[in-house]
Amino acid sequence: MIETDALSGGTPRRLVTQQPLSSQEEALERALRPKALDDYVGQKKAREQLEIFIEAAKKRGEALDHVLLFGPPGLGKTTLAHIISRELGVNLRQTSGPVLERAGDLAALLTNLEPHDVLFIDEIHRLSPVVEEILYPALEDYQIDIMIGEGPAARSVKIDLPPFTLVGATTRAGMLTNPLRDRFGIVARLEFYTPEELTRIVRRSAGLLEVQLGEEGAFEVARRSRGTPRIANRLLRRVRDFAEVRADGVVTAAVADAALSMLDVDPAGLDVMDRKLLAAVLEKFGGGPVGLDNVAAAIGESTDTIEDVIEPYLIQQGYLQRTPRGRMATALAWTHFGFVPPERV
C-alpha cells in the first residue's frame, strides 16, 4: 500500500516496507516488542543458540561473545539486541554505523561502558574504515589506542576497556569487511517468518492493542505481511482503524480482507511497488533476463532500494530470480498477473 504522511512531506511511503517511523509509531513498536526470549516468536534456530550462549556466559560470569545479526529489515534484529541485554541483566547502549563518523565518537561510547554491557550498532556495514580500525582491538583485547596531542607532540595512549558484548545488525552482511566479520563469535541469520508464526505475533499484538481479532482475521493479516513482524504490526494498526470505522471494531477475515484490499496489499502480500517491478520485468522485458539498472530505470527506483527492499521478498517467495544474465520472472509471477508462462520459464 502507498500512504502519505506529514513526516515525509507528502511523499508516498509503503506500508509493506521499512520506512522511518513517527515518534508515535516508534512508541507503539516498542510497546509491542517482546521483552524476553521466551516471548520471542519465530527464529527458532537463532533463539535456541542465544539461549544457550547467554546462559553459559552468565554461569561463567563472563561477557557474552560478540553477536552479528543479519537479515532483511523488520525481522527483529533490534528487538533481539534489547532482549540479549535484558537476559544478561546489563545495560544496552545503542547507536548506528552512519552516526559513528569519527574514531572519537566510538571511543566515547566504549569508555563509558560498564562491565558486560551490550553495545548495539545497527547498520554496522556502514562503519567508516577509521572507526573500524579502532573497533578491532576493542573487540579482541578490550583495549583502544587513541592519539593525544597534535603534530610532533602527538602520542598514542592505550586505554583498557571493561569486557563488553558488541551486537551488530545489518541487512547487507556481504558488505562487512572480512576482519570485522571474523571478530563475531556468534552469527545469526534471521529468516522470513511463516504465516503461522506471524499469526501468533498478530494475535499477541492485538491483545496488547485491545483489538477484537479472531483467528481467521489474524491469519488474513499475517499472510499479507511479507513474512515480516514489523509489517504485520503496521498492517494490524491500519486494519484496526478500518474495523473501528466500518465494522464495529471487530476484525474478521472479511474485514481484514476488505481493509487490506483498500490499502492495495493483495492476498500474496504484494503492494503497488512489487507489482510495478514484476509488471516491468514481464511486460517491458518479456520476463527477462534484464539487468538491475534497466529495471531501476523502468520503475523509477534506485538499485539499492530494489536490492534491499523490494527484491528479497519476491525472490524468497519465488516470483523473481537473480541469474548471471539478470533478473527473470518465474512462472509464479506470470500466473500471478494472469498470463500463461512461456515454455522457457
UniProtKB/Swiss-Prot annotation:
Q: Extract the ranges annotated as region (Large ATPase domain (RuvB-L)).
A: 4-193
A single GO CC term for this protein reads: cytoplasm
Tell me the segments the record calls region Head domain (RuvB-H).
267-345
Which residue intervals make up region (Disordered)? Answer: 1-22
Keywords in UniProt for this one?
ATP-binding, Cytoplasm, DNA damage, DNA recombination, DNA repair, DNA-binding, Hydrolase, Nucleotide-binding
Identify the residues that bind ATP.
Answer: L32, R33, G74, K77, T78, T79, E140, D141, Y142, R183, Y193, R230
Subunit architecture: Homohexamer. Forms an RuvA(8)-RuvB(12)-Holliday junction (HJ) complex. HJ DNA is sandwiched between 2 RuvA tetramers; dsDNA enters through RuvA and exits via RuvB. An RuvB hexamer assembles on each DNA strand where it exits the tetramer. Each RuvB hexamer is contacted by two RuvA subunits (via domain III) on 2 adjacent RuvB subunits; this complex drives branch migration. In the full resolvosome a probable DNA-RuvA(4)-RuvB(12)-RuvC(2) complex forms which resolves the HJ.
SUPFAM superfamilies per record: P-loop containing nucleoside triphosphate hydrolases (SSF52540), Winged helix' DNA-binding domain (SSF46785)
Query: Per UniProt, where does DNA bind?
Result: R322, R327
Q: This chain belongs to which protein, by name? A: Holliday junction branch migration complex subunit RuvB
Main localization category: cytoplasm
For the ligand (Mg(2+)), the binding residues are T78
Q: Which GO terms describe its biological process?
A: DNA recombination; DNA repair
Pfam families annotated for this entry?
AAA_lid_4 (PF17864), RuvB_C (PF05491), RuvB_N (PF05496)
* Subcellular location per the Swiss-Prot or TrEMBL entry: Cytoplasm
Whether DNA-binding counts among this entry's keywords is yes
Q: Which domain of life is it from?
A: Bacteria
Q: Which cysteines are joined by disulfide bonds?
A: none
Q: Where are the transmembrane segments?
A: none
> How are the domains described in the entry?
Has 3 domains, the large (RuvB-L) and small ATPase (RuvB-S) domains and the C-terminal head (RuvB-H) domain. The head domain binds DNA, while the ATPase domains jointly bind ATP, ADP or are empty depending on the state of the subunit in the translocation cycle. During a single DNA translocation step the structure of each domain remains the same, but their relative positions change.
Reaction catalysis annotation: ATP + H2O = ADP + phosphate + H(+)
